[in-house]
């Protein structure tokens, strides 16, 4: 009778873990089944209204991803706003320079500031399984086996349903031509060795106001692949850059 009670208790706990792990994975799959894209800009850029509609584009990519289609997308987005894209920097009223620094799978805490939900199921399974030891100290071997099994169940469920976030980080500089000369003071702190810095200053005269910002675009979906995320990340970046104009 006592042996049967142990078996029933172990079976009940393991069944609960199966249900909880399955529910956690299913909940993630349902909530994240559609691709969600978010784009944020670190600073707002205000440009003076102008009848000049010429833009020079310089698009770079120093990430490890191939983004040959990004420049054409930005060009089209700017043209759709009514601007003419020129290959001559001297003839352009605006310069738009952008560099993709990083495009990769990224933890949501790093990219969006909140904790990913993908690992809770496995941790819950392991914790519940280990708790069986307190039920009966005479069945340590059985408790350990169920604990490991419960943890593995949660891990397998989470491995099948993974909450994936891809993030693209881009630095953007926009230069706006002015009618009057501008004097710009540049200061650079160059690191010397492990504890020193060399400060360099220079002054230059030009005819452009310069503005800088950072664009962070994120795509989130269950079991997301970069091949699916890349087009929408590029579209969002192109839209954000064009909307500055």
From Swiss-Prot:
Signal peptide: 1-22
Residues with lipid group (S-diacylglycerol cysteine): 23
Highest taxon listed in the record's lineage: Bacteria
Database matches in PROSITE patterns: PROKAR_LIPOPROTEIN
InterPro entries assigned to the protein according to its UniProt record, in alphabetical order: TraT_complement-R
Up-regulation conditions: At 37 degrees Celsius in the absence of calcium.
Coiled coil: none
Membrane-spanning parts: none
Subcellular location: Cell outer membrane
Lipidation feature positions (N-palmitoyl cysteine): 23
Record's function text: May function as a virulence determinant.
NCBIfam families the record matches: PRK13731.1
Protein name: Lipoprotein YlpA
Native source organism of the sequence: Yersinia enterocolitica
Organismal lineage: Bacteria, Pseudomonadati, Pseudomonadota, Gammaproteobacteria, Enterobacterales
Gene: ylpA
């Amino acid at each position: 009778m006592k042996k049967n009670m142990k078996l029933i208790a172990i079976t009940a706990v393991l069944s609960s873990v199966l249900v909880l792990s399955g529910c956690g994975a299913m909940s993630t799959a349902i909530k994240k089944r559609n691709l969600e894209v978010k784009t944020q800009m670190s600073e707002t850029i205000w440009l003076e209204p102008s009848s000049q509609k010429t833009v020079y584009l310089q698009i770079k990519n120093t990430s490890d991803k191939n983004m040959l289609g990004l420049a054409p997308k930005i060009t089209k987005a700017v043209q759709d706003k009514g601007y003419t894209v020129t290959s001559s920097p001297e003839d352009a009223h605006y310069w738009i320079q952008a560099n993709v620094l990083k495009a990769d799978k990224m933890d949501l805490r790093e990219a969006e500031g909140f904790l990913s939900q993908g690992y809770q199921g496995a941790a819950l399974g392991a914790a519940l399984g280990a708790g069986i030891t307190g039920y009966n100290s005479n069945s340590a071997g059985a408790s350990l086996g169920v604990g490991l099994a419960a943890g593995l169940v949660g891990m397998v469920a989470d491995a099948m349903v993974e909450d994936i976030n891809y993030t693209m980080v881009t630095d953007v500089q926009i230069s706006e031509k002015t009618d009057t000369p501008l004097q710009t003071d540049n200061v650079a702190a160059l690191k010397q060795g492990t504890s020193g810095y060399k400060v360099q200053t220079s002054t230059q005269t030009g005819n452009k106001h310069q503005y800088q910002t950072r664009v962070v675009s994120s795509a989130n979906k269950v079991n997301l692949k970069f091949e699916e995320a890349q087009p929408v990340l590029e579209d969002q970046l192109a839209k954000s850059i064009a909307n500055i104009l």
